[in-house]
Amino acid sequence: MAGERAQNLQDTFLNHVRKNKIPLTIFLVNGVKLQGVVTWFDNFCVLLRRDGHSQLVYKHAISTIMPGHPVQLFEPDETAPEKA
């Protein structure tokens, strides 16, 4: 597989925003908007913290996750051709 990454993209993304305490907006499939910082996650849920309170959010209920600022997970591939 390409590079045999130890983690999948989802885990890499969640771990990055957790370690860097990046504020997120999470939209659920029912349209509810949640905001906070990821403090923990596993295969099934995400623990979101805001204003001293934690919310356990099941991943199957999540539609979209938007970080508060741009996130770069991987180094740019220098061998890839540049897009014009």
From Swiss-Prot:
Alphabetical list of Pfam families matching this protein: Hfq
Membrane-spanning residues: none
A GO MF term: RNA binding
Sequence ranges assigned to domain Sm in this UniProt record: 11-71
GO CC annotations on file: cytosol
CDD domains registered for this protein in UniProt: Hfq
Swiss-Prot/TrEMBL keywords: RNA-binding, Stress response
Any GO BP annotation: regulation of DNA-templated transcription
Family: Belongs to the Hfq family.
Assembly and oligomerization: Homohexamer.
Alphabetized PANTHER family for the sequence: RNA-BINDING PROTEIN HFQ
Function, as annotated: RNA chaperone that binds small regulatory RNA (sRNAs) and mRNAs to facilitate mRNA translational regulation in response to envelope stress, environmental stress and changes in metabolite concentrations. Also binds with high specificity to tRNAs.
Protein name per UniProt: RNA-binding protein Hfq
Organism taxonomic ancestry: Bacteria, Pseudomonadati, Pseudomonadota, Alphaproteobacteria, Hyphomicrobiales
Gene (UniProt): hfq
